């Protein structure tokens, strides 16, 4: 194998050329000097832009949560009560868990019936299978009400 070429240190940027002592001298007598901009350790090493186009920022991964909806329901039911961030996180995990169970059960039902599409009928049946007793009845009635409101609008 051929020996790898030595890496050259990255050229100094204009902001880094002046030492901090010189910047302090330029500052007015009563004020503190402005802090220098520094790159995080991981970004300073990757300044050459290997593998990615230079200048392009990495897009933030959007994280979808039910937090705002949980808060709205809480305020409808108990307007005077708040919720801690840990309790909110637990509620969000709970809703995600129920959603995954319902989606999995609906997918199974669609496969059993050799249907390529999950319809409201599969969702309703999966709600009856996953949720216990009275909770399933209330969920089905609220779901039916929501679907009729959606189709009529």
UniProtKB/Swiss-Prot annotation:
GO terms for cellular component: nucleosome; nucleus. Residues 1-61 are annotated as: Disordered. The keyword Acetylation applies. Gene3D superfamilies: Histone, subunit A (1.10.20.10). It is found in: Nucleus; Chromosome. InterPro entries: Histone-fold, Histone_H2A/H2B/H3, Histone_H2B, HISTONE_H2B_site. Can be acetylated to form H2BK6ac and H2BK33ac. SMART domains: H2B. There is a cross-link at residue 149 (Glycyl lysine isopeptide (Lys-Gly) (interchain with G-Cter in ubiquitin)). The modification N6-acetyllysine is found at residues 7, 37. Keywords: Acetylation, Chromosome, DNA-binding, Isopeptide bond, Nucleosome core, Nucleus, Ubl conjugation. Residues 1-28, 36-53 have a biased composition (Basic and acidic residues). One of its GO terms (molecular function) is structural constituent of chromatin. Belongs to the histone H2B family. The nucleosome is a histone octamer containing two molecules each of H2A, H2B, H3 and H4 assembled in one H3-H4 heterotetramer and two H2A-H2B heterodimers. The octamer wraps approximately 147 bp of DNA. Core component of nucleosome. Nucleosomes wrap and compact DNA into chromatin, limiting DNA accessibility to the cellular machineries which require DNA as a template. Histones thereby play a central role in transcription regulation, DNA repair, DNA replication and chromosomal stability. DNA accessibility is regulated via a complex set of post-translational modifications of histones, also called histone code, and nucleosome remodeling. This is Histone H2B.10. It comes from Oryza sativa subsp. indica. The lineage of its organism: Eukaryota, Viridiplantae, Streptophyta, Embryophyta, Tracheophyta. The gene is H2B.10.
